[in-house]
Amino acid sequence: MLEAKSLRKATVPRSLLQHPSPGNVQSNRLALHVNDDNSSCWVYIASGCRIYKLEISMQDSLVNRGKESLLIPEQCEVMNSSLVNHCPHRSEIQSIALAETERSDCLILGSVDSYGHLIVSKLDNSGKDVDRLTFSALPRDCGVGEGGWAGICFSPSQWCMAAVARSFCKSIDVYDQDIHLQTIRTLWYPSSLCFMQTLCSGNDSSLLAVTEGCQLSIWDLRMKENGGCVHRICGSLGDIFYTVCSSSTNIAVGGADRTVTIYDPRRWSALSRWVHCSKYEITGLAFSSIDSDYVYVQGVDYEVLCGQWRDSKKVLSFRGDSNWLGFSKCANRDVLGGWCDSGSIFLADITKENYIQSTDGLSNGVPS
């Protein structure tokens, strides 16, 4: 079973950012990176046309619990904070994402604004800004027309490949660095996207999962027939999907129906439905990197919970103190971060509880 090692609450210094810009329902304006020695975590947040970073300690601490096992955060101070040396956008940043290169010696920071303008920078793995590489890419229509929500995701196997979704334009642009590869046209307004990490796609990361309206669509970037769309799954009519995530074996979606649905990509059938797990709409999902039978769920009502989706059982949860402006999970470990419009940042470190096996082969219930 998963348990919390620490839950910390820090406040963005007023000298760095006094009034954050409002966010969309999809909270994509936060990204995390834990330092190599696991002593601290860099939290990247986007407000307006700029990106800021804060360093928060990852020291283990006593975790207090309230009613219904709700985790109570420990107040802490921000160790370091600064403006990221990242080219500013001309309009409000809608989403940011972090990726690691093949050698893991540097980070790739990508951001997209409300008109679909993509900017990518290379940063040092320790969190320092290094002018190694910066490039930008404009959408095919050069960003004309009306702006709106936009999302970004990197390929898990090729950091140079990124997909940018634009809700108002009903389009998804795929880039290899600053080279435009193709444009996908969706039927409805896209709200979330991710490259699939499933066994059926291997390591080529050619499959892209997109939530659009009340549908989950799967796109194969290698195909031209039917625009590349290989499968569509319809949810309840009128219940919009807001988020999608993928593990090595399954894919999950959530949205206005407050239900997490897990699909098997080999047959595209529903394995499990965790009905009404959140009090309000689900706007963020992430599979646990420790055990993919667990999933993290972020709701509009400030709550973040972790549960076993097969048994529809909640194991832990915590709450923000106001609306989420950003929420994210580290790519390869269970560290969660959330940013509220009050200026508070919540950082949770989750681990798996180990049990010592007794001589008769049964667990004695004592943590190792």
Language-model regions: role of each:
Residues 46-50, 112-116, 165-168, 212-213, ...:
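Short, flexible beta-strand-to-coil junctions
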Residues 1-18, 37-87, 115-136:
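Beta-propeller domains
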Residues 24-34, 88-100, 140-154, 186-201, ...:
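Canonical WD40 repeat/beta-propeller blade segments in eukaryotic WD-repeat proteins
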Residues 91-185:
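Alpha-solenoid helical-repeat scaffolds
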Residues 2-31, 36-42, 59, 301-304, ...:
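Terminal intrinsically disordered, low-complexity extensions flanking WD-repeat/beta-propeller proteins
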Residues 57-64, 117-137, 167-192, 199-206, ...:
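Per-blade loop-tip surfaces of WD-repeat and WD-like beta-propellers in eukaryotic adaptors/scaffolds
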Residues 27-29, 40-42, 48-51, 93, ...:
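A common structural microfeature
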Residues 39-44, 103-110, 158-164, 182, ...:
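Structural hallmark of WD40 beta-propellers
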